[in-house]
């Protein structure tokens, strides 16, 4: 199978018009006979809003509940992308980490992906479907939602590309390349020329 993983960041899915554009990009890959796996971040600002709400509830919000809360933004974006693809006549559905499952280990807020069950997604791809997978999240051995840390949707996409032997992993973002820190926030950010995972 010729698989491509497309990852869309918060800016790319930040408005309904941008989500419509994302659907057009996905459709172009489908037309070129790719089996497309999509990984989405939350819409721009959604995660920060959820983090702020957790702090308003209490200063020491439970790490376990924090992961449940902040991972919900990806669910919204995935559903909107899938809905737009369906409107365009493309078989699609959103997938959360527990539905696949994407297995993680480590602490809440800072877990890492250690395995992905490929079976459901492979069947879905073979049926012509486009899975829209929530980035940034997984489930641990206790079946609790965990997050991979800020920027974790990129890590999710890269790991999914690895587990599914994708031909390419393309990350759509609002910066050109990988930087030492967010270049939109710090002018001193340096672009990394070569990186491995």
Please give the residue ranges for each predicted region.
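Nucleotide/pyrophosphate-binding catalytic subdomain
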Residues: 1-197
């Amino acid at each position: 199978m010729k698989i491509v993983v497309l990852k869309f960041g918060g800016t790319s899915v930040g408005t309904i018009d941008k989500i419509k554009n994302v659907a057009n990009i996905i459709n172009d890959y489908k037309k070129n006979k790719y089996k497309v796996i999509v990984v989405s971040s939350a819409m721009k600002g959604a995660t920060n809003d959820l983090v702020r709400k957790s702090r308003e509830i209490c200063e020491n919000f439970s790490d376990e509940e924090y992961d449940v809360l902040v991972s919900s933004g990806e669910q919204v974006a995935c559903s909107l992308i899938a809905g737009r693809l369906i409107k365009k006549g493309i078989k699609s559905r959103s997938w959360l980490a527990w539905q696949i499952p994407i297995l993680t280990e480590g602490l809440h807020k800072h877990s890492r992906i250690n395995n992905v069950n490929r079976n459901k997604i492979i069947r879905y791809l073979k049926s012509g479907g486009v899975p829209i997978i929530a980035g940034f999240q997984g489930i641990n051995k206790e079946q609790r939602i965990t997050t991979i840390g800020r920027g974790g949707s990129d890590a999710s996409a890269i790991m999914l590309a690895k587990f599914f032997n994708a031909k390419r992993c393309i990350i759509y973002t609002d910066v050109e390349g990988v930087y030492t820190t967010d270049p939109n926030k710090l002018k001193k950010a340096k672009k990394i020329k070569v990186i491995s995972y």
